Design a protein with these regions (language model features):
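N-terminal small/glycine-rich loop or linker at the start of catalytic domains
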Residues: 1-24, 117-131, 199-200
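Glycine-rich, proline-tolerant flexible connector loops at the mouths of alpha/beta enzymes
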Residues: 36-71, 164-174
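Structural preference for beta-strand elements that scaffold enzyme active sites
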Residues: 2-4, 41-44, 70-74, 93-96, ...
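Catalytic alpha/beta core domains of metabolic enzymes, predominantly
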Residues: 108, 115-221
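Glycine-rich anion/phosphate-binding loops
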Residues: 19-29, 98-108, 134-146
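Active-site-proximal loop/turn and secondary-structure-junction residues that shape catalytic pockets
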Residues: 9-11, 47-51, 79-81, 100-102, ...
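Catalytic beta/alpha-barrel core
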Residues: 44-50, 71-79, 93-104, 124, ...
């Protein structure tokens, strides 16, 4: 099944940051409703851009969004303390964004996720950086799924992000991801695939056409 994560509630966006700073609930509510009307299956909530204010901003955003949210929320933060606070506030089973194999992030996130009932975005990133082959992606995905399974996260609750990279940098980046996705699905039929699909067209003309084509290929992979 194709699912959409609405990512507009992110304080790295200037208008959202201003709305959060001003506690402009109407702006946030309108944005969330538009994402839901457009078909979002999850609403991502990221309050990390205002340094020193993430906890209070996340709390305000959740208080503002939850009364009108018809879909689950994606709690987006690298800080387990912020996620712990947010997890206790949410009414629907959330998605956590995200864990990776980077040692610092992995070591911080695993204790938080241990025993939690949630969905998890798992980035195919480790301390060596971005993956350079479909085998890299598959190996990292396998490690992430196995480690998350050990702490009670079922495979069906894991959303693997193979880290889509621009074909403007290397023309094989698209086929690399598609090959990896096929291999991941063969190994873990219950796992979900997610990612920043529009990354594929970065730096190129006719981005919408490229994006639509790549989405179709990913859905068929």
């Amino acid at each position: 099944m194709f699912e959409v994560i609405g990512e507009r509630i992110n304080t790295s966006r200037k208008l959202v940051q201003a709305a959060v700073a001003d506690r402009d609930a109407d702006y946030i509510i309108d944005d969330v409703q538009k994402q839901q009307e457009a078909g979002a299956n999850f609403i991502d909530v990221n309050a990390g851009a205002r340094i020193g204010h993430e906890t209070e901003d996340m709390k305000w955003l959740l208080d503002t969004i939850q009364p009108i949210a018809t879909v689950p929320l994606t709690l987006d933060s690298p800080d387990p303390a912020v996620l712990e606070m947010a997890f206790k506030m949410v009414e629907k089973t959330p998605m956590i964004n995200s864990i990776s194999l980077e040692k610092e992030r992995f070591d911080a996130m695993m204790p938080f996720l241990d025993g939690k009932e949630c969905k998890v975005i798992a980035l195919c990133m480790d301390d060596a950086g971005m993956p350079n082959s479909s085998d890299d992606i598959l190996a990292r995905a396998k490690s992430l799924v196995q480690e998350l399974n050990k702490i009670g996260i079922p495979t069906a609750a894991i959303y693997v992000d193979p880290l889509v990279q621009p074909i403007s940098v290397e023309s094989n980046k698209g086929t690399m991801v598609l090959d990896a996705v096929r291999a991941i699905k063969a190994l873990f039929p219950e796992v979900h695939i997610t990612g920043g699909l529009s990354n594929i067209s970065y730096g190129l003309p006719q981005r919408k056409i490229i994006n639509r084509t790549f989405v179709s290929l990913m859905m068929d992979a």
